[in-house]
């Protein structure tokens, strides 16, 4: 009977299943109906057959579905396992219609514990086929798994927001019940196709096919445990994030336990697996990588469900998660890892934790917005004139002198502000429709604008606010906005200080336009634009700009950096370099110099000395940096064996002084490039302009020339410094005193000072000479005839005018951009006429300059080199400027070997110091150094050169100068002469001529008697002098008093410095006949001849005066004359 009943039951079930439609089998036959149907027939079957353990266990089949729902709703799985079957049945009736089978399918492809119990309803259908014990055993073993592991995985859900978001898409109809807080596998795919598949799997769960599928699904979790370590997405993450590679690889096996919950396994295996995983998996929990499946990206539309978790299940989970994470730091890391790696792994794990039960910190950093570093771009070249005049346009201009081309930063007005060269761009009217634009001729990323007011001593004009617009075609303009309206930029508060207005976000365009809104005074402004070029430049001249290949330190150097760099160069090339100090500045900073020579520290005979100075004005920084680069270049090239540099170093003693005004540089460097005005840092700390603070020797020389004292009474070279500049209270800067002392110690031949603000070479004279009345008259007549004013222009020229022009052209022609006529002048018109050279007095007349003082006080020919329009260029401009000036700097140094050189000695080969070397046709000589050597720079040609010294006979010879580099050797040997004695005799006679007595001329008896007395007196004086010389003890003679022994000398060399003439003259007399002269003076003051009385001698002299036919000799002259002749 039991077999018949079972057969009838099976037939009934098949009939019911056949009536169910294929599209919705769950709606026709629900689990509750199947449960009631089975219980009804099984109760009858149990009365006839003895109860089995499997049958008893088959009764709580609906419990897994109830647990799954509770886990979705946030309940505790253990409490569901202990719930009575009656309550479970009620819950099954409410929610098992559609969601049970669908969840079961998801559980097959995922590791989430909540979905696993939903596969049990189709397994319940296996019981009529005598396989209910298998179905009953499996759900009983699964509930404890579901209760143990959901507690461990809620923390994973808190760490991975993406996993929680994906699960909510599975059942949108029951979101309040399915809002999971612990999704176990974030990589499950929840597609509509999967939902359909789950329903099909539940329908196929009839008969033995369900057992086959269950068996087929059993090995899947084992394979899935290995898959995370070979995930393709994880491999990509390891390449991008190498720091997290070790942690991510070990944390991937974690999804395996959740997947194994779905399939029934013996409890022994389950207990073994967590033990093995505890050794490896627990430290990997907090950094479990997301599993994206086949690459499908789940949409993030369930953020609210995740970020507002349910409090009941999360509170215990969060605590467990934090405790587990704290324990993970104490667990060992990789095998064989060093202690340093272990500490780094611990910190990496701590950084990636989120102690607030949220997503990992590593993921937050990827998603969070961080401030982007601002792009710092250099100026496009408004101030440096790399932007040409035709690239600057404006809506209007007040007049040509205030046009758009004058709107460059730091543009200076001329002496007359009403001319064509004023100090800003000014609009024609004061309407707000005015603008000024710049065409960069390339696509540029603009980052800011620097504005400045008008340079004027009368007006106070500057722009206070403005708009900025951009365009690519100069037709359609886009205004810069702040997101709501056009952004207003604030400009200047005075006319001199530059103000930077940065753009919050860079803009890429070709044109930039400034629209002034408000201003002070008139609408006038100067500006500079900051931008980085995006596309190559189309300017015809910029295409030829070379790029440096030298490995040098291209950056601005502070005082400490400069000192450190010079120290490094000295250490790299100790055999050819030496660092020393000229003195100190007003603030106590040392003025450093570097000597480069094959024998540093010593002056070699025949080797000329050259100097480069820079930084006289602290804000003119380009020269300072070029000299620092030149130091490095000479050192590197000398070590590399560059023959040109080696010859230059071996034959020349080079002195480089990068900063003569370190105090001024520190002031200018605080503001930085482009932000200091024209005069900031120009003066010293005491307020002096070093270039114009030297003694004025031009006025002294020109006054002597007007009196015809040159070269007899006043020399034309090596003029002494006036006393007013030497007194301690003189208004001379500390730096100038140190420079003068340095110039007098070293016999410099050629030098140049590097400046900024213009692009030209200036040569002396720098002081304008007032023309005389005759010159003015001649100039007026020449102008009336239409001729050039040659006489007036010649008044500003030095005797070495042709040589100075040669030297200036040698630098300007070697410079890459100085002789380009289309560039024009920086501040005003081009005074050089495209040649790059100009006379200082014609261009910018000044008195007391460094160039004029060096030319008149020493042998050094000094020029001023103005390197560029921008005094303080941006750091990015240094490589370009180095290439523009490198060849010119080397070429100018080589000019020191042009001309003649030699040594002046006497007949015994002893060098003669302070000998004068003069060239016929050039009214300017040079002096020999302490070793008797000299250098005279001359243009190619043939010259008659004369060497003369005091006490020696002059010597002259013809010297030829070639075009090639290399001075012609011209040595002189001077013989001693009696001219020194003759000048002494004349001085003793009061510098009056000594008349010669003709013996053939008849004399009166009285004259003869007087002559005899004089002869007797001379004889007696001679005898007395001889006796005194024999009786006198040997020893140094006393020097004569200056009033009696210092005669005026008609030679050029005798009127040198007054403070040096006295000791020099005394020393010369001591070497010759000082004793004799001293004896005579003493005798004159104390005693006279024994046989001749003074009264008689005076009477005789009176008689001679009356007769007018004899000679009248003063008493002193007679005594001196007699003593001198007595020495022969």
From Swiss-Prot:
Gene Ontology BP, a term: regulation of DNA-templated transcription
Tissue-wise expression: Expressed in aorta.
Segments for region (Interaction with MAPK1 and MAPK3): 413-616, 998-1128
Description of how the protein assembles with itself and partners: Interacts with different types of collagen, including collagens I, III, and V. Interacts with GNG5, NFKBIA, MAPK1, MAPK3 and PTEN. May interact with calmodulin. Interaction with MAPK1 may stimulate DNA-binding. Binds to DNA in vitro.
Span list, region Disordered: 40-368, 1027-1056
SUPFAM superfamilies, per database record: Carboxypeptidase regulatory domain-like, Galactose-binding domain-like, Zn-dependent exopeptidases
Protein name as catalogued: Adipocyte enhancer-binding protein 1
GO molecular function, one term: calmodulin binding
Family designation: Belongs to the peptidase M14 family.
Residues that carry a glycan: 520
Alphabetical keyword list: Calmodulin-binding, DNA-binding, Glycoprotein, Repressor, Secreted, Signal, Transcription, Transcription regulation
A GO CC term attached to the entry: extracellular region
Chain segments carrying region Required for transcriptional repression: 933-1128
């Amino acid at each position: 009977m039991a077999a018949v009943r079972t057969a009838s039951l099976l037939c009934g079930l098949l009939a019911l299943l056949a009536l169910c439609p294929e599209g919705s089998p769950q709606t026709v036959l629900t689990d509750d109906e199947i449960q009631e149907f089975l219980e009804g027939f099984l109760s009858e079957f149990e009365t006839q057959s003895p109860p089995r353990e499997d049958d008893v266990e088959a009764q709580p089949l609906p419990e897994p579905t109830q647990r799954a729902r509770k886990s979705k709703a946030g309940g505790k799985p253990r409490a569901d396992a202990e719930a009575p079957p009656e309550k479970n049945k009620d819950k099954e009736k409410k929610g098992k219609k559609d969601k049970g089978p669908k969840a079961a399918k998801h559980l097959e492809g995922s590791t989430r514990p909540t979905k696993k119990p939903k596969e049990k309803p189709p397994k319940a259908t296996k019981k009529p086929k005598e396989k209910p014990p298998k179905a009953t055993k499996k759900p009983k073993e699964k509930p404890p798994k579901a209760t143990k592991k959901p507690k461990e995985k809620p923390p994973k859900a808190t760490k991975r927001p993406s996993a929680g978001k994906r699960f909510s898409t599975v059942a949108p109809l029951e979101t309040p019940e399915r809002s999971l807080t612990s999704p176990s596998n974030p990589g499950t795919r929840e597609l509509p196709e999967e939902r359909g598949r789950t329903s099909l799997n539940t329908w196929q769960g009839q008969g033995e096919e369900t057992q086959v599928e269950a068996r087929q699904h059993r090995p899947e979790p084992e394979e899935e445990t290995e898959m995370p370590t070979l995930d393709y997405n994880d491999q990509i993450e390891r390449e991008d994030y190498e720091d997290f590679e070790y942690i991510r690889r070990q944390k991937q096996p974690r999804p395996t336990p959740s997947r194994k919950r779905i399939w029934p396994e013996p409890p022994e295996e389950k207990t073994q697996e967590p033990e093995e995983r505890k050794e490896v998996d627990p430290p990997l929990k907090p950094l479990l990588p997301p599993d994206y499946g086949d690459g499908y990206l789940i949409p993030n539309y369930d953020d609210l469900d995740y970020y507002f978790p349910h409090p009941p299940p999360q509170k215990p989970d969060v605590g467990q998660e934090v405790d587990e994470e704290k324990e993970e730091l104490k667990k060992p890391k990789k095998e064989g890892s060093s202690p340093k790696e272990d500490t780094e792994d611990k910190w990496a794990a701590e950084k990636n934790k989120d102690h607030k039960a949220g997503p990992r910190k590593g993921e937050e950093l990827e998603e969070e917005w961080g401030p982007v570093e601002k792009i710092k771009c250099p100026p496009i070249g408004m101030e440096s004139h790399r932007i040409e005049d035709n690239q600057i346009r404006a809506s209007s201009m007040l007049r040509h002198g205030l046009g758009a081309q004058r709107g460059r930063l730091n543009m200076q007005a001329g002496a007359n502000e009403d001319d064509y060269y004023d100090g800003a761009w000014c609009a024609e009217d004061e309407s707000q429709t005015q603008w000024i634009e710049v065409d960069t001729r390339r696509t540029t990323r603009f980052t800011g604008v620097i504005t400045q007011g008008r340079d004027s001593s009368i007006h106070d004009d500057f722009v206070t606010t403005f708009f900025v617009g951009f365009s690519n075609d100069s037709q359609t303009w886009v205004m810069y906005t702040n997101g709501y309206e056009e952004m207003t930029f604030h400009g200047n508060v005075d006319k001199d200080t530059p103000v930077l207005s940065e753009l919050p976000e860079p803009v890429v365009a070709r044109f930039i336009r400034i629209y002034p809104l408000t201003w002070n005074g008139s609408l006038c402004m100067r500006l500079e634009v900051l931008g980085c070029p995006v596309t190559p430049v189309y300017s015809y001249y910029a295409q030829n700009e070379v790029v440096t290949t030298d490995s040098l330190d291209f950056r601005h150097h502070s005082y400490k950096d400069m000192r450190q760099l010079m120290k490094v160069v000295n250490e790299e090339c100790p055999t050819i370099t030496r660092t020393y100090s000229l003195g100190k500045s007003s603030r106590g900073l040392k003025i450093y110099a570097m000597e480069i020579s094959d024998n540093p520290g010593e002056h070699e005979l025949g080797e000329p000395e050259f100097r480069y100075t820079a930084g006289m004005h602290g804000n003119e920084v380009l020269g300072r940096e070029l000299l620092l680069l030149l130091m490095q270049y000479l050192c590197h090239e000398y070590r590399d064996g560059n023959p040109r540099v080696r010859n230059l170093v071996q034959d020349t003693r080079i002195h480089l002084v990068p900063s003569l005004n370190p105090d001024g540089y520190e002031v200018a460097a605080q503001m930085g490039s482009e932000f200091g005005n024209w005069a900031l840092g120009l003066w010293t700390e005491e307020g002096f302009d070093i270039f114009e603070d030297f003694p004025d020797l031009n006025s002294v020389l020109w006054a002597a020339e007007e009196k015809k004292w040159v070269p007899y009474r006043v020399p034309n070279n090596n003029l002494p410094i006036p006393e007013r500049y030497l007194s301690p209270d003189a208004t001379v800067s500390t730096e100038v005193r140190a420079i003068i002392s340095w110039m007098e110690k070293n016999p410099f031949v050629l030098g140049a000072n590097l400046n900024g603000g213009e692009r030209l070479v200036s040569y002396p004279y720098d002081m304008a000479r007032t023309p005389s009345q005759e010159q003015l008259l001649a100039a007026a007549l020449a102008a009336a005839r239409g001729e050039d004013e040659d006489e007036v222009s010649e008044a500003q020229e030095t005797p070495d005018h042709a040589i100075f022009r040669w030297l200036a052209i040698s630098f300007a022609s070697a410079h890459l951009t100085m002789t380009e006529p289309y560039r024009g002048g920086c501040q005003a018109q081009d005074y050089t006429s495209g040649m790059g050279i100009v006379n200082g007095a014609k261009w910018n007349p000044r008195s007391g300059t460094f160039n004029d003082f060096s030319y008149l006080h020493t042998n050094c020919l000094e020029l001023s080199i103005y390197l560029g329009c921008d005094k303080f260029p941006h750091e990015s401009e240094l490589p370009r400027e180095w290439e523009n000036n490198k060849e010119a700097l080397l070429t100018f140094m080589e000019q020191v070997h042009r001309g003649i050189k030699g040594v002046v000695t006497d007949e015994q080969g002893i060098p003669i110091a302070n000998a004068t070397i003069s060239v016929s046709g050039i009214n300017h000589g040079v002096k020999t150094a302490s070793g008797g050597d000299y250098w005279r720079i001359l243009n190619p040609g043939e010259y008659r050169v004369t060497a003369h010294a005091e006490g020696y006979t002059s010597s002259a010879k013809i010297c030829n100068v070639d075009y090639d580099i290399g001075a012609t050797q011209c040595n002189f040997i001077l013989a001693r002469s009696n001219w020194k004695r003759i000048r002494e005799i004349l001085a003793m006679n009061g510098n009056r001529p000594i008349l010669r007595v003709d013996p053939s001329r008849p004399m009166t008896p009285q004259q003869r008697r007087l002559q005899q007395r004089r002869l007797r007196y001379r004889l007696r004086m001679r005898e007395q002098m001889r006796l005194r010389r024999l009786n006198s003890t040997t020893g140094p003679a006393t020097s004569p008093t200056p009033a009696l022994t210092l005669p005026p000398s008609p030679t050029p060399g005798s009127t040198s410095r007054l403070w040096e003439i006295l000791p020099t003259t005394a020393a010369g007399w001591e070497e010759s006949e000082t004793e004799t002269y001293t004896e005579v003076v003493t005798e004159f003051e104390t005693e006279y001849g024994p046989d001749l009385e003074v009264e008689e001698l005076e009477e005789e002299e009176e008689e001679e005066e009356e007769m007018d036919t004899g000679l009248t000799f003063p008493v002193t002259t007679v005594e001196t004359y007699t003593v001198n002749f007595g020495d022969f």
